[in-house]
From Swiss-Prot:
Residues 130-151 are annotated as: Disordered. Zn(2+) 2 binds at C43, H49, H59, C63. Keywords: Metal-binding, Repeat, Zinc, Zinc-finger. This is Gametocyte-specific factor 1-like. Zn(2+) 1 binds at C9, H15, H25, C29. A zinc finger (CHHC U11-48K-type) spans 6-33, 40-67. The lineage of its organism: Eukaryota, Metazoa, Chordata, Craniata, Vertebrata. It comes from Mus musculus. Belongs to the UPF0224 (FAM112) family. Coiled coil: none annotated. The keyword Metal-binding applies. The gene is Gtsf1l.
Length: 151
């Protein structure tokens, strides 16, 4: 088995921590050293890279975890353009009269119902709710020792 790499704590150089525990150690050591923590900053490419604030820009420019995607200008809003429909009438759903419907006033005046948005809601059976609460369970029949349904 290969030995795990050891990292040096930026808050206390006497602390030598295995890489697998380094993130947890940084959080606890930051709390224990609030004065030193105010002078330090985390790299935006790797939270385990904690450097002095004055050296942060230099570190981020040369950080090994920096990728080409992050080098693009991500500070501005994302520009998205949607194609404009050329003819609005072609997109609308038209109501076609049904020959089976007769003797109804204004049958051709109402457009077809189209659901434009759907907000899903959690659907739960009442029996599931009762079981999760632990109450109102089916009572037992004392003669047969079987449960009766509450219908």
């Amino acid at each position: 088995m290969e030995p795990e790499s050891i990292e040096i704590c930026p808050y206390n150089p006497h602390h030598r921590i295995p890489l697998s525990r380094f993130q947890y150690h940084l959080a606890s050591c930051r709390k224990k050293n609030p004065k030193k923590a105010k002078k330090m900053a985390s790299c935006k490419y790797n939270a385990c890279h904690v450097v002095p604030i004055r050296k942060l820009a230099e570190h981020e420019a040369t950080c090994v975890n920096r990728s080409s995607v992050e080098e693009e200008d991500t500070l501005g809003p994302l520009q998205v353009s949607l194609p404009q429909p050329q003819n609005q009438d072609t997109l609308q759903v038209r109501w076609l009269s049904n020959p089976d419907i007769w003797n109804v006033d204004g049958a051709n005046c109402h457009p077809m119902f189209v659901l434009k948005s759907f907000v899903p809601q959690k659907l739960v059976c009442e029996s599931d709710i009762q079981e999760s609460r632990g109450g109102d369970q089916c009572p037992e029949d004392p003669q047969t020792r079987t449960r009766k349904a509450n219908f």
